[in-house]
Regions:
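Alpha-helical cap/lid subdomain in secreted, periplasmic
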Residues: 5-140, 192, 198-206, 211-214, ...
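Catalytic cores of secreted or luminal carbohydrate-active enzymes
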Residues: 121-195
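Short beta->alpha junction loops
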Residues: 1-2
Length: 305
């Protein structure tokens, strides 16, 4: 997923499992996350882990196949440096030890985003190298300083550090004209802990509403060629409505597998109560006819700096 959807997952998949070590990689998928959201959610994931666990954290920056090897390293590396989080840049490591042409061996066919087995092996080798370097340079046990428990002020804001994820198990709609509980689940997430589900409907124009509290409000949803698009918006405390935001649940390119997306509905600097509306699109092309739309949950950011 991208780092916004990771905010919704981090409690179940990392914090509640009391893991010893985690590698954070969103340099690839955050390319398709809205610019005003990327750094805030990436920093939010890091702060959630560092403030709620003793988990050791390393960052990984993966890139696309073709030059200039796109990825979000240029945005994420400064955040890691700010928090003294060690990182591995696949692109930098390959170009330092080999050549640009090496990346042609790390992807199959016309694939440009997902590395093949050799590509994953290359990434793993650089992670191992970084860990061995850190281990080699460790001081004697008695000279290892106590870990710092107080984080510095946030670079962006603290909203996503204190985000709450609403789903079918912890919130009920205040109105509903045709949505039912239940959404797709990722097999890997099932293996690692709880999988939160939301709501879906194939009824054209069906609307579901919720009352939530937060500074920034967004919705998460599942993408594939088996869905129909939806619309989402909020009613502000003064009774006015925000603009309607399209939820692109239908993605022709995702055939046989799911994508996981986040769309922000409102961004604020203080916690307020909002009414969230989601509506199954009334108009859709034939390719979406009869298919359901969905939301897997609502992500409500909390405090800000």
């Amino acid at each position: 997923t991208d780092s916004a959807f990771a905010v919704a997952r981090v409690e179940d998949h990392i914090i509640n499992n009391n893991v010893d070590f985690v590698i954070i990689e969103f340099a690839m998928n955050d390319q398709w996350l809205a610019g005003e959201t990327r750094c805030r959610t990436y920093e939010g994931v890091l702060r959630k882990i560092m403030n709620n666990t003793d988990t050791a954290v390393m960052a990984l920056f993966v890139n696309e196949r073709k030059e200039p090897f796109p990825g979000m390293q240029h945005e994420q590396q400064p955040i890691c440096e700010y928090y003294h989080i060690p990182f591995v840049s696949w692109k930098d490591c390959v170009l330092k030890t080999g050549s640009k042409a090496d990346f042609e061996n790390y992807f199959d066919g016309t694939e440009t985003v997902h590395p093949n087995t050799a590509g994953h092996g290359s990434i793993a080798s650089f992670i191992i190298e970084k860990l061995e370097e850190k281990k080699k340079n460790l001081p004697a046990d008695k000279k290892i300083p106590a870990p710092v428990k107080t984080l510095p002020a946030a670079m962006t804001d603290t909203g996503f550090e204190f985000a709450k994820y609403y789903h079918k198990d912890n919130i009920k709609p205040i109105s509903n004209t045709g949505w039912k509980e239940g959404t797709p689940r990722h097999d890997d997430w099932i293996k690692r802990g709880n999988v939160r589900e939301g709501w879906q409907t194939a009824e054209v124009g069906a609307e579901i509403t919720f009352e939530v509290e937060g500074s920034t409000i967004g919705v998460t949803y599942c993408e594939s060629d088996q869905f129909r698009n939806a619309l989402a918006w909020v009613t502000y405390p003064d009774g006015t409505d925000s603009e309607k935001v399209p939820l692109q649940c239908f993605q022709m390119s995702r055939s046989g597998y799911y994508g996981w997306a986040y769309r922000e509905l409102v961004k604020g600097d203080k916690v307020q109560k909002y009414t969230v509306h989601v509506q199954c699109s009334k108009r859709a092309p034939k390719s979406q006819a009869g298919k359901p739309c969905n939301i897997t949950g609502i992500l409500a950011a909390g405090k800000t700096k």
